[in-house]
Structures are given as C-alpha cells and as structure tokens.
Amino acid sequence: MTTLQVASSLNDIAQQTRQAASLLAMLSTEAKNQAIAAVAQALESAKEEILQANIDDCEAATAEGIAKPLYKRLQLDEHKLRDAIAGVRDVGKLADPIGQVQIQRELDTGLVLKRITCPLGVLGIIFEARPEAAIQIISLAIKSGNGVILKCGKEAVRSCEAIVKAVKQGLSTTDVNPEVVQLLTTREETLELLRLDKYVDLIIPRGSNSFVRFVQENTRIPVLGHADGICHVYIDKSADIEKAIAVSVDAKVQYPAACNAIETLLVHQSIAAEFLPKVAQALAEREVELKGDERTLQILPEIAAATAIDWETEYSDFILSIKIVDSLTEAIAHINQYGSRHTDAIITEDVAAVKTFFGLVNSAGVFHNCSTRFADGFRYGFGAEVGISTQQMPPRGPVGLEGLVTYKYQMTGAGHIVATYTGENAKPFTHKDF
C-alpha cells in the first residue's frame, strides 16, 4: 500500500471512529457500563485465543532477538490477563466522569453559567509490546465517552488483534458502536496517525524513551506521556534499616521492566556502612547487578563501578546503580538533575526530612516509606490507566478517567444581551454560585 493509500484509508478509519465516539458521548452511564461488562465477558470467553496469540507473538519475537525488557512487557500470561479483565470491571464501577457540573453560577437573574465535563473526542494510543495496555485503555475510553485508535508494536500484533476482535464482538451486543475502537498494525500507519490532528484529539505513547520522544517530535496533536522512567529511592540517615531493605528490593525486582521500578539507590553516608552490605546481599539473592560510585565501592568492593551515564540510564532490568550522598539536600539535587519526574521515594523516620523531600522533589509521585511500584493507576484506585504523565501540566502521574475528559461552558438565558451590562448605566452581575 502506498503512503497516499495509507493516509486515505486511515482518514476513513478516523472519521468512522469520530462518528462512533460522538454517539458514545451521548449514552447514559448505564449503557456505557453495560458495554464495559460485555467487553469483560467477551475477553473472558476469548481467553484461550488471546493467550495463544500472545504465545505466537513471543515465539516470533524471540526468533527476531527481541530485547529482554521488551520481551517481559510482551508476555501476557493467564494471571496478567485475569488482572486486566478485573480492571475492566473495576472501571465499570467507577463514577461516570462525563456530565459532572464543575461550576454553576448565576450571572444575573435568569442567566446561568455551567461548566460541564465532556469527552475529549478520539484518542490515539501508540504502544510497544504490553498487550494488556490495550484492554485497560479500551475500558477507560468507553467509560469516558471517547473513541480510541490503537497502534500496537509489531511484536504484539497477534495479541492485540485477538483482544480487539473480542472487544468488538462484545460491543456488538450493546448500544456502543464497535467502530469506536480501531486497531492499526503497521509503521506507516503510525506516521499517518500522528498527522491526523483534524480527527484525533490526544496522542498517548507508551514505550521506550526513544519511541516516546519520536512521537513527541513528529506530531501537532497534544501528547500525554513520559519519555523516561528513572526513579530513585533515597535512604535517609534516619531510615529504619529493615524498611529500607524491603522497599529497595521491591522497587527494583518486583517488575524491573516497569517504568516505576527504581534505577538508582541513594544512601546517606552516615547509614551506608550498615545498610549497604545488607541490601547488597538481599539484591544479590535476586540476581541484581549492582554498580556503585567510589564511596560505595569502598564498602562493596566486589561490585562494578558506576559512571555518570548510569545516573541517567533507565535499565528496565536487574541492574541498580548506587550512590552515597552527604545530605538530604544532595539527594534531592541528584534526583532533580537525573530523574525523570516520575516517582521517587524517601525512607526515613524523620518527619521534617519527609516534608522537605515532598516539597522539593519535582516528580509526579513522591513517596515515603513505600515502594515506587505503587505508582500505578490500578493501585491508586483509578480502575486502570491509559499511561503516566511526567509533564508539569495536568493530568500528571497515572492517568485514569479524569485525564480523558475536558469541559465546556453552557449558558442559559432569557433573551439576555451584553449591552445591558455595559455603558454608563450598566447593570451589575450577581455572580452567585449555586
């Protein structure tokens, strides 16, 4: 297919999605929840087909020499699929984000202004591997009244085709037009999707650093996402050693390919001699490769030396860099210089240190005495997430339903005109909030 043919075909798909989304936006909460329940049931019924498609994807990816972190994201086992379907049902239980009155204000007698939440329109989701992301995103899109065009990586095509097939079958029995969900599978379609600013309202990329940056640099459509997942745990001088070990190990090994896994461990110099040998042993038992700065090597001479590159590297693997710092101030400076504004944690029993850390670390998530792996829409109670944003502007952090809506102003009058409120005898506004 030529570039022109791809563009023409994708324009048609985008128009169909937008039309279907406009009808979805008008449906009742009950109708949307029924559709979400039907999607969950259809996915359960297609479980074997989806899992087999993923096995086929994994085998093909292995033959092509896929990178280890990407392979881990690609794998969809029965446990992951079950959790994803449970997440769909959880979205059905969430409050409807559409039609919420944010402002209701009388400007004058009979002249009332409202600000009401409404869908964004059509979402363009581009992701590498991680087929369960498609399930999460589809459920959130339906609940928030948005159409969604999914573009999966070539390594996950079979899995995503099986998922979207099941979703469309489920929607076909409901009031939601199945055309509200679309799937693209080729690189050429990715480039054309990024040009569809007439039909697509938001692009959400999920993948590697280079991939997200490519998307950000090649579209005029607003992009929500993050390009890096360089997270830290700082072990303060007042840390409880056992808590520090447990959190450090969990934040690194529970799922090292996740963007909320830590890449650097910062340790206060006054606690380093006691803490580092213990945490090193715990991490070694989980086969984590350690790298350390000069002072760390004096305590752990058997590990590799860290370089400046390590502080800005997202390993997404069983590798962890360690640096000893002289103070909380130095730890915060390191995080703000090398971190990705994703999620960073402090382990301490010092309340004042927590307040300083929370106030000065410029990340979407700042945690105290708990693992960075909690930075997740499902764990936050959002039902699921479409992605994580490290941007300064909202939405920020794990993005659930609230990040997929915008608002419009509705005003109702009785023949009111602006001339009444201007000039020498201008009538004053009442500006009374209901």
Curated annotation (Swiss-Prot):
PROSITE patterns: PROA. Belongs to the gamma-glutamyl phosphate reductase family. Coiled coil: none annotated. It comes from Nostoc sp. (strain PCC 7120 / SAG 25.82 / UTEX 2576). It is an enzyme of class 1 (oxidoreductase). Its EC number is 1.2.1.41. Catalyzes the NADPH-dependent reduction of L-glutamate 5-phosphate into L-glutamate 5-semialdehyde and phosphate. The product spontaneously undergoes cyclization to form 1-pyrroline-5-carboxylate. It is found in: Cytoplasm. One of its GO terms (molecular function) is NADP binding. One of its GO terms (cellular component) is cytoplasm. Its main location: cytoplasm. This is Gamma-glutamyl phosphate reductase. It catalyses: L-glutamate 5-semialdehyde + phosphate + NADP(+) = L-glutamyl 5-phosphate + NADPH + H(+). Transmembrane segments: none annotated. Keywords: Amino-acid biosynthesis, Cytoplasm, NADP, Oxidoreductase, Proline biosynthesis. It holds the Pfam family Aldedh. GO terms for biological process: L-proline biosynthetic process. InterPro entries: Ald_DH/histidinol_DH, Ald_DH_C, Ald_DH_N, Aldehyde_DH_dom, G-glutamylP_reductase_CS, Glu-5-SA_DH, GPR_dom. The keyword Amino-acid biosynthesis applies. Pathway: Amino-acid biosynthesis; L-proline biosynthesis; L-glutamate 5-semialdehyde from L-glutamate: step 2/2.
